[in-house]
């Protein structure tokens, strides 16, 4: 990660890099911990972007990170996706096929995922415990 930190610093961007820690089993708790850290450092405002990434896909390019940040700034959130190559089958009752969506319109979400941190915090704070437990 050090090379990415130096790379973004040279571009004059204002990035806060906190301690990199092992995530919690629940994504929502991990993200809220990161947002709380940013807030405790006095760096949480309307323009703060949080980028989440998992260790399953350790090799992320500068281009993907830059695009995530740019689109999160513009649209409020950005998900890295790849086209689905397998057929996706929906089963609402877990026994019968309910729907087979058109593959050409399906994508698989990956990481990084990027968000306006304050907006994401507000969404999480308005979720029920049951909703948070499922995230």
Model-flagged regions — what are they?
Residues 46, 59-135:
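Conserved core of the sugar-phosphate nucleotidyltransferase
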Residues 34, 54, 116:
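Residue-level signature of catalytic and energy-coupling elements of molecular machines
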Residues 1-46, 130:
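Conserved N-terminal catalytic core of the sugar/cofactor nucleotidyltransferase
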Residues 22-25, 55-59, 64:
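Active-site-adjacent loop/tail segments of enzyme domains
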Residues 43-56:
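Short beta-strand-to-loop acidic/aromatic patch adjacent to the donor-nucleotide binding site
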Residues 23, 52-53, 80-81:
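Generic beta-sheet signal
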